[in-house]
Amino acid sequence: MIIELDNTHKQDLSSLRSLSAEIISEFCKIALEFIKKGSNKKLYMGASQKLNIAADKIESLVDSITYLFSECTRFMLNENDFNDTLAPIKLSDEVIEILRESYFDNRKDIRNTLQEFYPHLDHYQNLEWRLDTQIANRSLGSSINPIYLLKLITKCGSDNPIEHLLQTDPNNLKHLCNELESALNEIRTYENRLIIRNIK
């Protein structure tokens, strides 16, 4: 899989051609700090004075490197895909090597940092059910609909399981089962399996 970079990111990354290996490594470190701790204007100002480059240009370049690293980490790109992503920019082998090394050395940390921003949703653990129906009633001549009582148990991370008590009638339960079956069939398609494989 290849990450499609927009024109702004391509322009910023192409400006790495004119910089030395030491400065590119420094930009990679600043980008990694940006991912972990957020933006630091003082760093940009210091780098601006040291390199004689406008602070907003430095910030834009760091943003582009940050985007490259975070997107590559999100899709867990391998070495070939990483190289193919940068191929349209026509960077030298040395520049690509510095970026690649910085990315692969820190990929696990970047992934852990990015996961903190994702919502922590409950996951299914167990489901128990019981069918309740009234056998007889003198006041009602018509038949009585049975009721399903469901106990859904979910868990979020290492927290204790949470019990959810639900009640439904057979028609709604059948509709729910049909919708879940449809969702399971949808997730088995080639496109969705490809997306899921890249998310993991």
UniProtKB/Swiss-Prot annotation:
Signal peptide: none annotated. Belongs to the COMM domain-containing protein 2 family. This is COMM domain-containing protein 2. Component of the commander complex consisting of the CCC subcomplex and the retriever subcomplex. Component of the CCC subcomplex. It comes from Dictyostelium discoideum (Social amoeba). Disulfide bonds: none annotated. CDD domains: Commd2. The gene is commd2. Residues 123-191 form the COMM domain. Scaffold protein in the commander complex that is essential for endosomal recycling of transmembrane cargos; the commander complex is composed of the CCC subcomplex and the retriever subcomplex. PROSITE patterns: COMM.
